[in-house]
Amino acid sequence: MGDVYELVLSADIRADVTDDELAELRWHVGEGPRPEWLPIGSDRYVETYPLGDPDDPDCEWENAEAEPVFAQRGAARRVGGALVAELVARERSDGWALTVRQELHPDDFYRLRTLLDWLGRCSVDAHAGGAGFFVGYLRFHESVEIAPLVLSNGRIHVPEDIETHTPYWEDTGL
């Protein structure tokens, strides 16, 4: 795990997210079981493995299981400090507060990007007149420079590190 990144994220999520979306988010932060259906789309980018000769038209393929992105806990291996993820209800039932600090490998960037797209659309400040809001950062574990995550116009704009590691990304605009 040489290519490790530190992810720090803080977002306020609207109260009108569906129960199914909330169940998937709870699974991602380690606060619930994996739902049968993943409406955020966390299962769109799972690896597929051939169970034989991939050139054989009758070859069967096995799909990897989707894994939670923010469920790591305990001491960080590379970035120091603790790995955490917390999802709590905001006062007056006006939504949810999410805070995350995780170590991620670039192989996790497709799943991360899926969550960031959803969080951008569902954030309290998603459509705050074009203003940009700092919601976190991504940092290579050996660097002191951070790549900011900025929420603007319903999107969390991802750093170049994520863009270059997710070349086949399809923005479905869900």
Model-derived features: where do they sit?
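Short, extreme N-terminal segment that most often corresponds to the first beta-strand
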Residues: 1-37
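Charged interaction segments
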Residues: 27-28, 48-174
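A compositional/structural signature for long, glycine/proline-rich flexible linkers
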Residues: 32, 41-51
